[in-house]
UniProtKB/Swiss-Prot annotation:
InterPro entries xrefs: Haus7-like, Plant_AUG7
Gene Ontology terms: biological process: cell division
Protein source organism: Arabidopsis thaliana
Stated role: Contributes to the assembly of the acentrosomal spindle and phragmoplast microtubule arrays as part of the augmin complex. Regulates the association of gamma-tubulin with the spindle and phragmoplast microtubules.
Protein name as it appears in the record: AUGMIN subunit 7
Compartments, as annotated in UniProt: Cytoplasm, Cytoskeleton, Spindle; Cytoplasm, Cytoskeleton, Phragmoplast
Coiled coil segments of this chain: 169-197
Domain of life: Eukaryota
Main location group: cytoplasm
Keywords for the protein's UniProt record, in alphabetical order: Cell cycle, Cell division, Coiled coil, Cytoplasm, Cytoskeleton, Microtubule, Mitosis
Amino acid sequence: MAAKQMEEIQKKLRLLSYPRANAPAQSLLFAGMERYALLEWLFFKLLGDKSPFSQQNLQGDAGVRDEETVRIQYLAEIAKFLGITPTVDIEAIQGHGTYEDRMEMLRNIVDLVEASLFSDNQEWSIDEQVAKDIQLIDAIAERQSLIFSEECKLFPADVQIQSIYPLPDVSELETKLSEQAKILSNLQQKVDDLAAKHAYNPDEEYTEVESQLRARLESFLETARAFNTIYTKEIRPWTHMMEVPQLHGFGPAANRLLEAYNMLLKFLGNLKNLRDSHAALSIGSSGTVAGEPSSVTRIVSDCEAALTVLNRDLGILSASIAREQGERL
């Protein structure tokens, strides 16, 4: 079986016009000058005219051991370059493995050479091929109805061929395009007219809301300051200077005052969220000066300062009420 396969390899070598195709099979499969000469011939058939390697580098006295080593090394580099071996494998050039392994490697190389030679077409050019392809496409376009007709049956019956539907006329498409262009032009003119009548202000709605918020916060701040003034002048002397029994009768009023304080604290506690939200919204606003707080931010800061005073006063008032309730018990 192996001998028959080797005969087929040598037959291919004769068809490829290798001058020593009739050499003994052993000399082609095992290390020696006959094998190296065959591999050299096959490799340069694969490399072609634009080879980065030169056959002159392989010339030398075949009987000298150093020259033979250089030749084997050079063939191993070419084999790696061609992808025949993954690395520079000297043993592969000399031949290793079983008889079948050696024959398989040689057969693969011969098949590569055969495929590359018979696939070459010296008369072929890409320009001519492109011209032929264009002619084919033109012929298909001219005979479209015939190609997709039922007589030809080039496609299965369940395949829907979109091209069988009538195509719109080019002049009709141009007319519709012109009409759409006019509509677009009219719309653009209307947009330009509106823009000329009303100046575009991206911060318009934002500015109005900010103004309303500022007014409400200013009103609240005024109320908070007035309340602190009343507390300092009227309530504080009672809670700090009068004895516990003298607070009799102040309890119901104090409870109402405490409820008002708690509601006030709940409102003021949301000022931080209000300030953060305003800071996020005001980023990029044309009315915001870099490095300077806005009017809303300043008012919120003032309200927070008032909250600090209210917290302190509330603690004193709560302690007084708790003390009075303890005396009653």
